[in-house]
Amino acid sequence: MAHKKAGGSSRNGRDSEAKRLGVKRFGGETVLAGSIIVRQRGTKFHAGTNVGLGKDHTLFATATGKILFEVKGPLNRKYVSIVAE
């Protein structure tokens, strides 16, 4: 005879870990070449002058300078650029 009541089998109880996406360096900040500026899924922000786009859509500085966020173009896209100092 069982001395414990039968336990239920829940189908919950798991979650994926956070991916730490978002803006890592903000407008006006000085960054070194190679610094990650934005981690994103898709192109919420587009690469402007002196900014590269990684295969996972990460934006990174290709030159040392100050970050400039701007909205431009007919589709009002958000661009991230580096103004070289």
From Swiss-Prot:
The organism's place on the tree of life at top rank:
Bacteria
Q: A single GO CC term, please?
A: cytosolic large ribosomal subunit
**Does the keyword section mention Ribonucleoprotein?**
yes
Q: Matching PROSITE patterns, A to Z?
A: RIBOSOMAL_L27 (PS00831)
MF terms (GO), sorted A to Z? structural constituent of ribosome
Which one Pfam family would you cite for this protein?
Ribosomal_L27
Keyword Ribonucleoprotein listed: yes
Name a biological process GO annotation.
translation
Identify the keywords attached in UniProt to this record, alphabetized: Ribonucleoprotein, Ribosomal protein
Tell me the segments the record calls region Disordered.
1-21
What family is this? Belongs to the bacterial ribosomal protein bL27 family.
Q: What is this protein called?
A: Large ribosomal subunit protein bL27
User: Origin organism of this chain?
Assistant: Aeromonas hydrophila subsp. hydrophila (strain ATCC 7966 / DSM 30187 / BCRC 13018 / CCUG 14551 / JCM 1027 / KCTC 2358 / NCIMB 9240 / NCTC 8049)
